[in-house]
């Protein structure tokens, strides 16, 4: 089978010539026409008979595939192109967009479901300062800070979280992004100017993000973090609970540091609500601000569970809130 990439329809005579010189049947020359969206490619290949040829060559019975659901998705994608919403993705690896591919696709999934195309503004947090903050973020309807490690660009992320909180702009913090939200809130709402994460500062008197107790003696790297799927219990009356529509969820994790329980009550007392915890209540899994349009942080990685036809509830809720800002 030859699948031929082409920007224009493959003429029949060219198809016959390729088949002749490559010693394959004519119906085994499959044009792969340039599509306006990647999600349209399965429909185009089915139209050209790829599945039928594969089934014949493998000796499998070829039924009639039901592509209606996928066709509806593609139709929805094209319909969403009429409306746009800009989300700032503030990270430290933004020069390589594929570093955040799962996050970008999750925003695309959510945007499609909400009838809008999400335009990502890639912001390198290392270059974000108090001087250029407003100019950089003023055109955005939402701000997302994704996961990451190391202290490079951390202060820029904190500035972005502060801007979102104070300006009422929807914010979604994922893993490190949730920790950034807690640090920012502790500094500027709780009044602890030196608040930080123990990962980035060994001298802060307010390590609102600290190493998890069971990670204290771990020195080996690679596969030693809190990894994989864990349950999370959502508090009633929170945006998180509303987004998911259920009390208990299971999400995928990859981290060593957590919101410190030492400062938890004090931070909650000034307005940062713990929206989700581990079943025993010890680990903070989600935080949010009740009187903000959407200021939500999660310690887990929701982008790993988003699908084209089933956008993740947190991304969907975030995009809905961003659209409401327009």
Q: What is the predicted role of each segment?
A:
Residues 1-291, 299-326:
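N-terminal beta1-alpha1 cap of cysteine-dependent amidohydrolase-like domains
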């Amino acid at each position: 089978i030859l699948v031929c990439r082409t920007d224009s329809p493959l003429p029949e005579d060219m198809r016959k010539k390729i088949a002749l010189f490559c010693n394959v049947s004519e119906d085994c020359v499959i044009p792969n026409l340039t599509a306006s969206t990647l999600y349209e490619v399965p429909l185009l290949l089915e139209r050209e008979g790829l599945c039928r040829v594969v089934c014949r060559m493998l000796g499998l019975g070829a039924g009639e595939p039901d592509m209606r659901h996928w066709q509806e998705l593609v139709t929805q994608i094209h319909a969403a192109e009429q409306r746009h919403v800009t989300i700032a993705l503030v990270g430290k690896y933004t020069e390589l967009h594929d570093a955040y591919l799962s996050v970008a696709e999750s925003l695309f999934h959510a945007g499609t479901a909400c009838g809008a195309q999400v335009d990502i503004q890639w912001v390198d947090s290392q270059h974000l300062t108090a001087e250029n903050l407003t100019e950089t973020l003023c055109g955005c309807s939402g701000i997302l800070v994704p996961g990451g490690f190391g202290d490079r660009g951390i202060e820029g992320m904190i500035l972005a979280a502060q801007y979102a909180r104070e300006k009422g702009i929807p914010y979604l913090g994922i893993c490190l992004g949730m920790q950034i939200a807690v640090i920012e809130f502790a500094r500027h709402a709780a009044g602890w100017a030196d608040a930080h994460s123990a990962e980035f500062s060994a001298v802060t008197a307010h390590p609102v993000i600290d190493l998890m107790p069971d990670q204290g003696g771990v020195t080996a790297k690679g596969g030693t973090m809190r990894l994989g799927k864990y349950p999370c219990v959502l508090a009633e009356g929170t945006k998180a609970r509303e987004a998911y529509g259920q009390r208990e969820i299971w999400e995928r994790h990859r981290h060593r540091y957590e919101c410190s329980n030492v400062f938890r009550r004090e931070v909650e007392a000034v307005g940062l609500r713990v929206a989700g915890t581990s079943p025993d209540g010890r680990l903070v899994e989600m935080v949010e601000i009740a009187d903000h349009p959407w200021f939500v942080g999660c310690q887990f990685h929701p982008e790993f569970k988003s699908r084209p036809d089933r956008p993740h509830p947190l991304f969907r809720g975030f995009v809905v809130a961003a659209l409401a800002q327009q």
